[in-house]
Amino acid sequence: SSTLKFELPYSINTLFKLLQDAAKVFASAGFDIEIVEKHHNQKLDAPSGTALALADSMKEVLEDDYFYRYDRSQLRQKRDPKEIGISAVRGGTIVGEHEVIFAGEDEVIEFKHTAHSKAVFAKGAVEAAKFLAGKPAGMYDMRDVIAAKN
């Protein structure tokens, strides 16, 4: 079953697919998965919806026993190999930064997206509106918008 993703930037939607492909390879090779997200100091939710959507996209292709770990501050135990760690940073005027880390033995692979302005969200919204014009009522997401452009 697929989770609907309403993230508007094309880049984030492309990242969903890249992470699914990477998660299949690296999780089975024993890599740990971590997400670190950063936003401005006025943001109320933590972790962000985008961080959760990134985690959800990977969890869709992983074994059912993977779970999210939001806080390790009270734990005194080794990291569970089936956890996806999600950490949130809030400070300054950071528009949005999401980093997904696959940490293995003697190597680390990182995927990172940084939004320098909210314009990337507006561009995606405009493309989505153009796509929806004249479409019958139904459930769509940005994957439909991207597929229509290819």
Residue spans for each PLM region:
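Conserved small/polar residues in nucleotide/adenosyl-binding loops
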Residues: 1-4
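Rossmann-like NAD(P)H-binding beta-loop-alpha module
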Residues: 14, 18-30, 46
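C-terminal substrate-binding/catalytic lobe of Rossmann-fold NAD(P)-dependent oxidoreductases
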Residues: 30-150
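Active-site capping/gating segments
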Residues: 7-9, 13
